Amino acid sequence: MLKNIIKQVWNQRRQNGWILLELIIAGFFLWTVIDPVYVLTVNHFTPKGYEEDGRYVLRFGAYGEKHGMRDTTVTKEQQRTAIDNMLRLVRDCPEVESALLVQNSSFPNGGSWNGTTYYADTLKSEERKYVNTQEYTFNNAGGGNLFKTYGMKNALTGGDIEVPQDAGGRNLIYVSENFARHMFGTTDAVGKKVYDYRDRAHEIAAVFKDYKHRDFEPIYPLIIRVNNKVGVGPYMHWTYMIAFNLKKGVDEDAFVERFEKEVAPNMAMANFFYDRLLSFDKQRTTWAKQSGTY
């Protein structure tokens, strides 16, 4: 019986070869065309996890060591004060609802990505459970709250997420639904602890709704850390940005025009200067075009 089957297959090898070639072509088409379209379509209809309207990040620059405008007498403390003053200038705008200092990898569709690994315990074994995750960091000085500024919500209650002023000192962290499910198998993770690569414990203060860092990519685990200190160094203007959201009903074009005319010039201090505003929606469009998914 087996010999007859083998003989039949061999006698029809040319026909079978064409069938195999057709299957290979069809599989290649499904892999290169249908699968990406399916992924992009599903991803398009997946909630972002944040609000875009009226959300901006402000980038500032710094004069280099050889620049003619650089003041060589500026101290680190003056630079730290300058960052606080620039943040205050944004917060004092009547159109602005809230503003805070974030690291440059901590806003949607940004050009940077900060990845790390968190563990379920401190046991050094092959069975040690871990999650590779993206990490956002923001400064909560003066009541800064990334969740309110970005419009992110509590996954369990659907409400706002409050951030205690001492959250950074207590090593509190905030995790996405995706992270909680990967680590614990449930989103009911408030009060549980996870450990960083140095085995430092971090208590989960809240679980927020899944969040897309880049609009054209699937959702990835995300944790958000709070820092109540501003590190001072030669690359501060690359490390930090000011994120803010406008009050409802504000004319965004009119705001940007007024801001760049009246507020931005006042940000020239301690070798820093205003660079530009990036709106969340335009930033998303820019990255979509660069990725070829627009």
Spell out what each predicted region is.
Residues 12-42, 50:
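Short, strongly hydrophobic transmembrane alpha-helices
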Residues 34-124:
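Membrane-proximal extracellular/periplasmic loop immediately following the first transmembrane helix
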Residues 40, 90, 96-99, 147, ...:
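Generic structural signal for small/hydrophobic residues in well-ordered secondary structure
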Residues 131-222:
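Hydrophobic secondary-structure segments that place a key small or acidic residue at a functional site
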Residues 169-170, 177-178, 198-292:
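"Rare, low-scoring activations can occur
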